């Protein structure tokens, strides 16, 4: 069974983690051999950006081995989470695939996972990503093989 972990933190954007949670939950419902878990720095209630309160299943210290870690964005990703040494260490230690949603890219950049790569994020945070000192390139549009990502206002 594959394990998908979704990192959550105070001021995480609800849609950024509930969207992937729903997608992988439905995949399991229709037969995919996977489970999805939520992970936070501690096993205590997280207050999301718009007031939703969530208690994670695991802390960073007791999280199971992951096949995929999803790092969502939100105000928390732009402020405290991207500078949290414990979160950055956890992200760095992942041996499976790692993906970000929106400003979760700032956490990946600070953890060094985007070194040598081109990455994008929410258009209002692109300058924050561009300020990153490591060898990465921030861009409005990124494409690789058959996947493309672009973030501009509608």
Name what the model sees in each region:
Residues 114-142:
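A conserved active-site-flanking secondary-structure segment within enzyme catalytic domains
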Residues 28, 133, 153-154:
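Short leucine-rich amphipathic alpha-helical surface patches
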């Amino acid at each position: 069974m594959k394990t998908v972990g979704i990192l959550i933190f105070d001021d995480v954007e609800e849609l950024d983690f509930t969207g992937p949670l729903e997608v992988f939950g439905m995949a399991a419902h229709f037969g995919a051999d996977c489970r999805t878990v939520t992970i936070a720095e501690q096993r205590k209630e997280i207050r999301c950006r718009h007031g939703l309160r969530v208690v994670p299943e695991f802390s960073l210290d007791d999280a199971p081995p992951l096949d995929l870690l999803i790092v969502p964005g939100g105000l928390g990703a732009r402020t405290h989470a991207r500078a949290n040494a414990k979160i950055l260490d956890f992200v760095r230690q992942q041996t499976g695939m790692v993906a970000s949603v929106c400003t979760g890219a700032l956490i990946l950049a600070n953890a060094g996972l985007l070194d040598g790569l081109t990455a994008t994020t929410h258009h209002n945070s692109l300058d924050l990503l561009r300020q990153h000192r490591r060898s990465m390139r921030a861009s409005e549009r990124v494409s690789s093989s058959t996947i493309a990502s672009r973030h501009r206002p509608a």
